């Protein structure tokens, strides 16, 4: 039996595509031994001065850096150590870690948040991301027959990982040790989004340092960046020969390690700036201190979690859309014709946008209907194929022992509705095109006209009222002045005094009548004329 062509080609070409494992990494160091921090307890509660344990000479120790900039090497090749891939290359820049001309190793990926400037670490990460995306696309786009809902993957996703359970248990144990209330009912929550680790400085009095550190691999470089640092006081700080900041008041203890690479026990890190290190190469310009790293967990009591999840009801009402539109129209009326024009243009623009949205909705309905029609066609083809395959047993329905289902195509109703929507859209577009912004103003005239009469009367009264009032005042004043001028001669004739002749007998009554109403000056001038008669009579 002859093999198919593609199977034969695969069997022939398979040996040529066999991948070979990368060579072992040759980044071992045995001439200069590494040092490790060890704390020994002088008595419970106090930490003695640190001592150092050196590896014996000849002990091979693998050293790799976590970050290597692109300008530090010409080329890099893959190597393997302890079933882990690393990059190896020769240093060409004296300022890079390792030294000029030294062959060093560094990790396959750099840590999150850093870039090597387009080097092999960035390229490896980009390649890995593309592979994951293509794999997900291939899995989700594969056309497989429907076999019901497969919830096994969902169950695997929802199943809690063992390391996560261990992390929660450790956090709860630490909470019971440090909390005075010893809470029994609480919630320990992890954020779904990425958040940086939290740095907690190692206290001055702590008696849980490990005395035995067995390691054959050293990672030089930052492990975590962008830390959240808490309680920056009473720190145990580390200074090197090139450390400049040695007057920090937050440090209560300074430790000077040797010039060789210094590593810390598991669970303790050097924090320099906002980055965490497991090992330092004996030089650091910034101040470093010893710290723990914990995940960004949040601990809630039952009441706190209830208050956080269940928000308090708000008394603020949501404004109703017609009320908002009415308020805009009244505001336009209050600000005059300019406000009305602005409001009208705004509503015209809003109407145009709504018309465009309606067109997009119609297009979406047509697209969905086309997809449904194509899906229905595929289903009908599959049904015919199944009927042909199971024709000897009576067709698909008899073969499955189920009721037969038939597809009733009602796409014509959707097509008619879409046609009606398109006709309405076209009529509305023509109305908007013919009327324009000022045409919409005519639609508002039945509501505006009742207000125009009183408004015009008030405006006319304010404009011409002062002039009319001034004219009335001037007219009344002129008439009063004319009346005064006419009455002035009569008043002068009434005040004139007539002299009585000498041969006329004196009458007391007449004298009184003559001088009655006369001014005092005229009476005084008239008195000498009356004295001779009075003397003669006496």
Curated annotation (Swiss-Prot):
Keyword Chloroplast: no
Motif, CXXC: chain positions: 186-189
TM spans (from-to): 444-464
Region Immunosuppression: start-end pairs: 380-396
Side of membrane Extracellular, spans: 21-443
SUPFAM superfamilies xref list: Virus ectodomain
Cross-referenced InterPro entries: TLV/ENV_coat_polyprotein
Stretch list, region Disordered: 496-538
GO CC term, one of those recorded: plasma membrane
Biological process (GO), any one: syncytium formation by plasma membrane fusion
Keywords, comma-separated and alphabetical: Cell membrane, Cleavage on pair of basic residues, Disulfide bond, ERV, Glycoprotein, Membrane, Signal, Transmembrane, Transmembrane helix, Transposable element, Viral envelope protein, Virion
Cytoplasmic-facing ranges: 465-538
Short sequence motif named CX6CC, residue ranges: 397-405
Site (Cleavage): 317-318
Posttranslational modification: Specific enzymatic cleavages in vivo yield mature proteins. Envelope glycoproteins are synthesized as an inactive precursor that is heavily N-glycosylated and processed likely by furin in the Golgi to yield the mature SU and TM proteins. The cleavage site between SU and TM requires the minimal sequence [KR]-X-[KR]-R.
Essential for the fusiogenic function: annotated segments: 465-484
Assembly behavior: The mature envelope protein (Env) consists of a trimer of SU-TM heterodimers attached probably by a labile interchain disulfide bond. Interacts with the C-type lectin CD209/DC-SIGN.
Biological role stated in the UniProt entry: This endogenous retroviral envelope protein has retained its original fusogenic properties and participates in trophoblast fusion and the formation of a syncytium during placenta morphogenesis. May recognize and induce fusion through binding of SLC1A4 and SLC1A5.
Additional detail: Ortholog of the human HERV-W_7q21.2 envelope protein.
Domain observations: The cytoplasmic region is essential for the fusiogenic function.
Entry-linked PANTHER family: SYNCYTIN-1 (PTHR10424:SF48), VIRAL ENVELOPE PROTEIN (PTHR10424)
Name of the protein this chain belongs to: Syncytin-1
Gene of this entry: ERVW-1
């Amino acid at each position: 039996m002859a093999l198919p062509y593609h199977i034969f080609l695969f069997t022939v070409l398979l040996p040529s595509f066999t991948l070979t494992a990368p060579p072992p990494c040759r980044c071992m160091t045995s001439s200069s031994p590494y040092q490790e921090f060890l704390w020994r307890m002088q008595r419970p509660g106090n930490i003695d001065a640190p001592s150092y344990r050196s590896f014996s000479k000849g002990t091979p120790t693998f050293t790799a850096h976590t970050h290597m900039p692109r300008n530090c090497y010409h080329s890099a090749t893959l190597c393997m150590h302890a079933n882990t891939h690393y990059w190896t290359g020769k240093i060409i820049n004296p300022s890079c870690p390792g030294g000029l001309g030294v062959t060093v190793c560094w990790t396959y990926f750099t840590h999150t948040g850093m870039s090597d400037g387009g080097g092999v670490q960035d390229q490896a990460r980009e390649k890995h991301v593309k592979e994951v995306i293509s794999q997900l696309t291939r899995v989700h786009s594969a056309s497989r027959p429907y076999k019901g809902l497969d919830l096994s993957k969902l169950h695997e996703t929802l199943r809690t990982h063992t390391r996560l359970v261990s992390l929660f248990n450790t956090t709860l144990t630490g909470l019971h040790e440090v909390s005075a209330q010893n809470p029994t009912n609480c919630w320990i929550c992890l954020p779904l989004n990425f958040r940086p680790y939290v740095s907690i400085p190692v206290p001055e009095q702590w008696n849980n340092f490990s005395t035995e550190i067995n390691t054959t691999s050293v990672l030089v470089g930052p492990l975590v960046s962008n830390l959240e640092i808490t309680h920056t006081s009473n720190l145990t700080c580390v200074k090197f020969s090139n450390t400049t900041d040695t007057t920090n008041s937050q440090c209560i203890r300074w430790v000077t390690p040797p010039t060789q690479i210094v590593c810390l026990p598991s669970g303790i890190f050097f924090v320099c700036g906002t980055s965490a290190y497991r090992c330092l190469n004996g030089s650091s310009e910034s101040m470093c201190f010893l710290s723990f790293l914990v995940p960004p967990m949040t601990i809630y009591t039952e009441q706190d979690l209830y208050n956080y999840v269940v928000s308090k009801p708000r008394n603020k009402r949501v404004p109703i859309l017609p009320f908002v539109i009415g308020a805009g129209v009244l505001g336009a009326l209050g600000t005059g014709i300019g406000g009305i024009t602005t409001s009208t243009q705004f509503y015209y623009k809003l109407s145009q946008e709504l018309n465009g949205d309606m067109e997009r909705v119609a297009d979406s309905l047509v697209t969905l209907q086309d997809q449904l029609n194509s899906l229905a066609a595929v289903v009908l083809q599959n049904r015919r194929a199944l009927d042909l395959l199971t024709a000897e047993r009576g067709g698909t329905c008899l073969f499955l022992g189920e009721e037969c289902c038939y597809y009733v195509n009602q796409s014509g109703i959707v097509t008619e509705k879409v046609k009606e929507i398109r006709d309405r859209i076209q009529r509305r577009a023509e109305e908007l095109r013919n009327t324009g912004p000022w045409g919409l103003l005519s639609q508002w005239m039945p509501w505006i006209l009742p207000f125009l009469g009183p408004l015009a009367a008030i405006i006319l009264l304010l404009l011409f009222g002062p002039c009319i009032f001034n004219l009335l005042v001037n007219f009344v004043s002129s008439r009063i002045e004319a009346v005064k001028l006419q009455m002035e001669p009569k008043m002068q004739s009434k005040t004139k005094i007539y002299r009585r002749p000498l041969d006329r007998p004196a009458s007391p009554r007449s004298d009184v009548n003559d001088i009655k109403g006369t001014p005092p000056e005229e009476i005084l001038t008239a008195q000498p004329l009356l004295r001779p008669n009075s003397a003669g009579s006496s």
